[in-house]
Amino acid sequence: SAGYVAMGLALNGGKPAAVCCTSGTALLNLHPAVAEAYYQQIPLVVISGDRPASAVGQMMGQTIPQPNVFQSLVKMSVTLPEVKDDNDDWYCNRLINEALLELYHNGRGHVHINVPISEPLFDFTTEELPEVRVINRYEGLNEYNNNFEEIFAKINLFTQRMVIAGQELMIYQFDDAVNQRMNRHFVWFSEYLANQTTPSKCITNFDAILYTLTEEEQKKYSPDFLLTFGGHVVSKRVKQFLKKYPPKEHWHVASDGAIVDTYGCLTKVFQVSVFEFLDRFTSYLMAKENTPYLRFWEMKSKQIPEPQLDYSSVGVVGSLIRKIAPDSVLHLANSSVVRYAQLFKIPRKVEVCCNRGTAGIEGSLSTAIGYAHLSDKL
């Protein structure tokens, strides 16, 4: 009956309620309440203790397969890792945030958080729980539930602001007025895979810049605010840089609202078109001159020359890029080819495509053939 009691609490208070249980069949006893909560769309959080995965099927007490035990009756089911290092800690935090955010994502519902615990089970020595990261998600920019004026105004508290644009299709382009406002306030990092969803002044050779920076420079010129949008970013170096020197705030804009924590420091997700977001967001930016932070990255970018390596794969990529005609389409294979391309200037109207979803090189030529079949472009 504990599940029904929790359901009643959620019904009466209008807020999520949690029910906790031990491992084994104690979890199955909650099944009827979980089914009822599913059809009433009640925000219920089921938290179950569990034995380690290695104990399942080994005649250990109170042990059954618990991950995803409720299947389609919950909006999300997560099994937390047993935290042994920083990566486990990040993963655990991310999963809990994902589960709790799903309670009200695209409608109400309930979630299951499964918590494996190894022996000893009764040795609790922590006197005070630590502060943990909380990720917030905003579905649209409706003022009914959120004060976006207050949220967006906070951006002016930060002085070292950066945007990273991920892979996007060529058909998506920003208004010039938005580009100009963002240019005055943000350092833009972009690979060519982002196409024209970035201003003409964006920094494309950032991977090479990071390679030249000292540890002191990396720390000093790391962003305190990061804004991201789009799909995949190839550069491992920028991911390592931001994980080592994380910003105080990382906002990600995605039309599906997915929790994608590429840099390990995500704090807010805006489920909205990036065009709608930036049109609204930039109106809150206070007028400023070009800051030392922007000037540093622009200077470093200009100091990196195009490589002159004739007898190498880098040289081959460079020689091909120099011959590309404007308004053509460039299909890149993956990984190293994308990184090499970043070292050269590609005409702005060239569309760049790459099968970066799975980061595999198979199908690159076939994709280019399929594209060319319906295109008049070179």
Language-model features: where?
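Acidic, glycine-rich active-site loops and adjacent beta-strand->loop/helix elements
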Residues: 1, 22-27, 48-55, 192-196, ...
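Conserved thiamine diphosphate
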Residues: 15, 62-109
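A short, small-residue-rich loop immediately preceding and capping a beta-strand
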Residues: 12-51, 222-230, 376-378
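Active-site diphosphate/adenylate-binding microenvironment
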Residues: 296-377
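Glycine-rich phosphate/diphosphate-binding loops that line cofactor/substrate pockets in enzymes
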Residues: 9-14, 101-107, 148-161, 181-182, ...
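Glycine-rich, anion-gripping cofactor-binding loops and their flanking helix/strand elements
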Residues: 29, 165-251, 347-377
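Conformationally flexible catalytic loops at phosphate/diphosphate-handling active centers
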Residues: 95-98, 102-157
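Hydrophobic or amphipathic alpha-helical targeting/insertion segments
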Residues: 27-28, 34-77, 106-110
